From Swiss-Prot:
This is ATP synthase subunit O, mitochondrial. F-type ATPases have 2 components, CF(1) - the catalytic core - and CF(0) - the membrane proton channel. CF(1) has five subunits: alpha(3), beta(3), gamma(1), delta(1), epsilon(1). CF(0) has three main subunits: a, b and c. The lineage of its organism: Eukaryota, Viridiplantae, Streptophyta, Embryophyta, Tracheophyta. It comes from the Eukaryota. One of its GO terms (molecular function) is proton-transporting ATP synthase activity, rotational mechanism. The modification Phosphothreonine is found at T90.
Length: 238
């Protein structure tokens, strides 16, 4: 495992320090989100998200982050959202009710606002959840919150790295990986490595952090080889 990891170090560094990982940014924000964001457009002009997120969920998370920073409510909103996610896990009927498209928008909105009041959520949290409820986006809440947590972690200098392997990394190899990541990401950042076991990758590893993915799995290499072998060969050009 260590040899497979070391053989990919130089390639890993190349990928990690560039923007070569494919990403597509949405050309337009959800209209209601734009309205939410422009409420304080002049005061948020100097706030930048610590990492660029893509997709509709990333846009929601980014605008909430900007609003939270300007209102000095980042920690409170983070806590509120974590509590809401936990509440939906422990009360699945309520969660299903808030996401059910057949529930009238006004009823769904009233339920969310009442829940926010009872939980004593901050006003920005309440407004944001109400926005999602009004536009039928509560079904995306878990994904949005995960994106938002990426931003808050980056804001604090924390970098979460997900490493997928067939078997758990031995301590020595995890230490080597962490040291390599620290060198790439830079001093002053706190790196947290989370390991995920997935036998379907056959071997090697997949490293994901800060919107970057380095796939050094045997599964992917085998798929690439299969595609290469399936391509027709033009013997005239040999």
């Amino acid at each position: 495992m260590a040899n497979r990891f070391r053989s990919g170090i130089s390639f890993f560094k190349t990928i990690a320090v560039t923007d070569s990982v494919s990403s597509v940014r949405s050309k337009s924000l959800f209209p209601a989100l734009r309205t939410y964001a422009t409420a304080s457009a002049q005061t948020t002009a100097n706030v930048k998200v610590p990492i660029a997120l893509v997709g509709e969920n990333g846009n929601f998370a980014s605008w909430l982050y900007i609003a939270a920073v300007k209102m000095n409510s980042l920690e409170k909103i983070e806590t509120d959202l974590s509590e809401m996610i936990e509440a939906m896990k422990t009360a699945p009927i309520f969660a299903q009710f808030t996401k059910d498209p057949s529930v009238p928008r006004g009823t769904r909105l009233a339920a969310i606002r009442d829940a926010c009041d009872q939980a004593k959520f901050a006003e920005p949290t309440k407004n944001f959840l109400s926005l999602l409820a009004e536009n039928g986006k509560l079904k995306n809440l878990d994904a949005i919150v995960k994106k938002f947590m990426q931003l808050t972690n980056a804001h604090r200098g924390d970098v979460k790295v997900l490493v997928t392997t067939v078997i758990p990394l031995p301590p020595a190899e995890e230490k080597e990986l962490t040291e390599t990541l620290q060198e790439i990401i830079g001093a002053g950042k706190k790196i947290t490595v989370e390991q995920k076991i997935d036998p379907s990758i056959y071997g090697g590893l997949i490293v994901e952090f800060q919107q970057k993915v380095l796939d050094m799995s045997i599964r992917t290499r085998a798929q690439q080889m299969e595609r290469l072998l399936r391509e027709p060969v033009d013997f005239n050009n040999l």
